[in-house]
């Protein structure tokens, strides 16, 4: 009997153990593996977190993919190459106890969740969607406790944008191929941005500089200072030429300079609001020299999660695609505690920031650190150089936004000489406030010396300076993003790709930091301005963005927007196709002769960049790459090392003496030899290292780039 009971007990234990091992887990689906890794560490063993690797369904690339006869119905297909990923998602979903869709908290993320729900046969009206503004343990666990249905307003807003862009791109691009050159394309928002850049270039070309003169005087008092002439008989003065300037100086030399009016004021400077996507892109360009693409790449890393020593995996910043400056009460309270503990009560103010734009999605916050106590310098060792720079920028801006104003003492003095009035100003910082953490490039304190009304001043010099009015500056990435935001063109997720797209299409080029339109860019925008005026009109583009926002909050039906747009657009297409004549592209002839037939080579544009082709085409089909020397001699033969491209378009560096010399490098060589083995050093940049490494695979020498 005892044996039977023991066997029975063992069977029960085995069955229980088997039941435990087959217990179903909850499945959480996110976009990226790094995000999955971070969230997986927060949720524990009862959850499995996997990544969809972005979109799984989209419009086909091979055709328009919009059923115009069926009220603009999108013809979605599974994205090519995602078959195995979709199989994995279906398998995991089928085996799961419950499925949560945790894609990003914006239109694009909502649309990805909707497509996933379709593929996994989930009901989008069921509470399957979880959202969080920051990837921290508390935020993620709270989101899992509060799932909601998929918001179809946001999905439809994304669908409307996608279909609009497809209608424009897949209709105008073939027209450009036929009339200008194959391979060209036109986008809705990008075309409006290109128009802005081209209009600025036209302003610069049409600008006629005007001469003007400035007169300044130096004075000796308790401290030397300078004043500038700005009034004549109480009116603003304009000095147009040298003769007028000389006459004024002659008059000034006949009279005394007398202090006429002194005003002293206390002025305050307010801290800036926390970053939006746009202001982060602008500041990172101006302060740490990141372009918009790099800014968003690094910001995405900070958002999705970084392994911090002593803390673990954590998303360091809140969601990075936002046009809101609002901050949650919890984040403001955390900032208050930090400021009081580290700087004192006199530095805390607790500012609230209202969104300036009515379209701002108030469900989002401004960009901020997820944990204000993770001070940039304290976690620097856990971050790459670029991550540290950007995190410090975000952290400083947020903490400063909750601090008191900076206070200045301002003094201004009018100095009179006959009918002429000079103005001198000075200021001094008397309380730093938010500047304690958010340093700004400002002139050093320049207080005026003690002055009294009626005081005669000793003149040390009178200086005349010839000047000319300057044309408007070309756009930089930062100033273009600022202008796009001011004109309400695009949204946080669209700013970064715009410049890259226009450069890839060869519509603009970089000149140092400036953006300059190419001849091709002008050709395309002139055609579009004539035949598709609305597409390139900034007001029309801004109004369309507002309509898309209305779709997002379910005020407007997304199909109504498409119907209103496509009718007139279809007629414009017909007119353009009839009236635009074929434009013969100008060919740039070089002084390089073809080694096969002796004719001159011409510069051509290809998929992987510029190359040389024989002008005798099609009789002679000789082509060769354009050689760009990097200024480093080949260690084998002494000839120049040049930049080259592989068949797949990847850049590498090889000897210009090829095929006689086959020396080549994947990393860019520098004109410096390894102190250990004598081989050339090459540039290398990874998440954890930026500097020079030895090109000899058997040598481990490396040196970091000094910051």
Model-found features: residue ranges?
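Short helix-coil junctions and helix-kink-helix linkers
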Residues: 279-292, 481-491
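Alpha-helical scaffold elements adjacent to nucleotide-binding pockets in ATP/GTP-utilizing enzyme cores
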Residues: 38-42, 88, 111-119, 139-143, ...
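Intrinsically disordered, low-complexity regulatory segments
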Residues: 1-162, 171, 246, 354, ...
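C-terminal or mid-to-C-terminal helical accessory/interaction module adjacent to the motor/catalytic core
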Residues: 135-219, 264-265
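Basic, low-complexity terminal or inter-domain segments flanking catalytic cores
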Residues: 4-5, 10-27, 38, 45-47, ...
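Core structural elements
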Residues: 161-171, 217-219, 267-279, 297-311, ...
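Metal- or metallocofactor-binding catalytic centers and their adjacent structured scaffolds
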Residues: 239-273, 455
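Conserved short loop/turn motifs at secondary-structure junctions
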Residues: 24, 104-105, 181-185, 264-273, ...
């Amino acid at each position: 009997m005892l044996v039977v009971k023991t066997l029975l007990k063992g069977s029960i234990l085995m069955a229980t153990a088997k039941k435990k091992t087959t217990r179903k887990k909850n499945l959480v689906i996110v976009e990226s593996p790094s995000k999955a890794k971070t969230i997986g560490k927060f949720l524990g063993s009862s959850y499995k977190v996997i990544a969809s690797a972005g979109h799984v369904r989209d419009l086909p690339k091979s055709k328009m993919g919009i059923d115009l006869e069926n009220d603009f119905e999108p013809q979605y297909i599974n994205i090519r190459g995602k078959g195995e990923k979709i199989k994995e998602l279906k398998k995991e979903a089928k085996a799961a106890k419950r499925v949560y869709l945790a894609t990003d908290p914006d239109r694009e993320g909502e649309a990805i969740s909707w497509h996933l729900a379709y593929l996994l046969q989930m009901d989008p009206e069921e509470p399957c969607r979880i959202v969080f503004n920051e990837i921290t343990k508390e935020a993620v666990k709270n989101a899992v406790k509060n799932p909601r249905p998929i918001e179809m307003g946001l999905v439809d807003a994304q669908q409307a944008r996608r279909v609009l862009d497809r209608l424009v791109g897949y209709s105008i691009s073939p027209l450009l191929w036929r009339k200008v050159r194959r391979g060209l394309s036109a986008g809705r928002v990008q075309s409006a941005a290109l128009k802005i850049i081209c209009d600025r270039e036209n302003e610069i070309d049409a600008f006629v500089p005007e001469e003007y003169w400035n007169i300044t005087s130096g004075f000796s008092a308790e401290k030397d200072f300078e004043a500038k002439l700005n009034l004549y008989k109480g009116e603003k003065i304009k000095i147009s030429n040298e003769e007028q300037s000389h006459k004024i100086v002659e008059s000034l030399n006949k009279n005394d300079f007398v202090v006429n009016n002194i005003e002293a004021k206390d002025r305050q400077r307010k801290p800036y609001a926390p970053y939006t996507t746009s202001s982060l892109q602008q500041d990172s360009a101006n302060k740490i020299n990141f372009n918009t693409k790099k800014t968003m790449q690094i910001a995405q890393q900070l958002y999705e999660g970084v392994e911090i020593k002593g803390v673990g995996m954590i998303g360091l910043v809140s969601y990075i695609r936002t046009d809101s400056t609002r901050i949650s009460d919890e984040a403001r309270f955390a900032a208050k505690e930090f400021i009081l503990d580290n700087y004192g009560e006199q530095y805390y103010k607790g500012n609230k920031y209202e969104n300036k734009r009515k379209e701002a999605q108030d469900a989002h916050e401004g960009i901020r650190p997820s944990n204000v106590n993770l001070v940039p310098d304290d976690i620097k060792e856990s971050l790459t150089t670029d991550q540290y720079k950007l995190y410090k920028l975000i952290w400083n801006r947020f903490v400063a936004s909750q601090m008191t104003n900076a206070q200045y003492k301002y003094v201004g003095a009018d100095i009179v000489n006959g009918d002429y009035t000079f103005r001198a100003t000075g200021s001094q910082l008397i309380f730093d406030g938010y500047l304690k953490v958010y340093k700004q490039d400002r002139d050093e304190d320049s207080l005026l010396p003690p002055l009294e009304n009626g005081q005669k001043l000793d003149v040390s010099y009178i200086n005349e300076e010839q000047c000319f009015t300057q044309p408007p500056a070309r756009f930089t990435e930062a100033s273009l993003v600022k202008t796009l935001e001011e004109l309400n063109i695009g949204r946080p997720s669209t700013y970064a790709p715009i410049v890259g797209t226009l450069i890839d299409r060869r519509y603009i080029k970089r000149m140092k930091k400036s953006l300059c339109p190419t001849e091709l860019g002008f050709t395309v925008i002139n055609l579009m301005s004539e035949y598709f005026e609305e597409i390139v009109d900034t007001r029309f583009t801004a109004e369309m963005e507002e309509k898309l926002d209305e779709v997002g909050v379910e005020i407007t039906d997304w199909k109504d927007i498409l119907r209103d747009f496509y009718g007139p657009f279809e007629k414009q297409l017909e007119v353009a196709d009839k009236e635009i004549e074929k434009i013969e592209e100008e060919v740039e002839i070089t002084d390089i002769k073809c080694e096969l037939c002796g004719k001159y080579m011409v510069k051509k544009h290809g998929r992987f960049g510029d190359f040389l082709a024989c002008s005798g085409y099609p009789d002679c089909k000789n082509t060769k790459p354009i050689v760009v020397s990097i200024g480093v001699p080949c260690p084998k033969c002494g000839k120049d090392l040049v930049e080259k491209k592989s068949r797949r378009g990847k850049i590498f560096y090889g000897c210009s003496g090829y095929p006689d010399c086959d020396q080549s490098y994947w990393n860019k060589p520098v004109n410096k030899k390894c102190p250990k083995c004598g081989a050339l050093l090459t540039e290398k940049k990874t998440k954890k290292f930026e500097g020079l490494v030895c090109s000899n695979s058997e040598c481990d020498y490396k040196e970091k780039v000094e910051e």
